[in-house]
Amino acid sequence: MKDPIVKKTEEKMKKSVNSIDEELKKLRTGRPSPALLEEIKVDYYGVPTPINQVATVNVTEERSLIIKPWEKNLLNAVEKAIQASDLGLNPMNDGNVIRLVFPTPTTEQRQKWVKKAKDIVEHGKIAVRNIRREILKELKDLKKNGEISEDDERRLEKEIQNLTDKYVEELDKLFERKEKEIMEF
């Protein structure tokens, strides 16, 4: 059975890595993805509402997204929300659906996105290491108070370090995958 301290550490680190993974999914890659629109809110009867709660978003094969609002009167609101976002895309409203065409990104844009992905992953690594530092301090306090032995402290420190290495490696893999996704075209 796992030690509660190790279990708590693993849960925190996993949560941190999952958060970074979600952030990377929202990063633009030149490839259309409905996840890019998750943060955009549409004025739905005075309430800011995510696009995916008022419309269907589909990826088409020709490098575009099709947004079909469930209510036709939302077309203009969805279009305005996309224009106001920082995606830099020009929505085309044909009266029934909104089409978002993703132009082929320049090498410079791709490099900028890779740098952004690297920054996001670096923040994740810092979070994982901060969790390790916090838990190691907890272990020192437990030993100082006589709640655990020196052998237990060393064993737990080693387990915590192994978890840290595991999750930092996982973050590196997430970055490599995202970098590959950004650079391929």
Swiss-Prot record:
Pfam families: RRF (PF01765). InterPro entries: Ribosome_recyc_fac (IPR002661), Ribosome_recyc_fac_dom (IPR023584), RRF_sf (IPR036191). Responsible for the release of ribosomes from messenger RNA at the termination of protein biosynthesis. May increase the efficiency of translation by recycling ribosomes from one round of translation to another. SUPFAM superfamilies: Ribosome recycling factor, RRF. GO terms for cellular component: cytoplasm. One of its GO terms (molecular function) is ribosomal large subunit binding. Belongs to the RRF family. This is Ribosome-recycling factor. It is found in: Cytoplasm. GO terms for biological process: translational termination. Keywords: Cytoplasm, Protein biosynthesis.
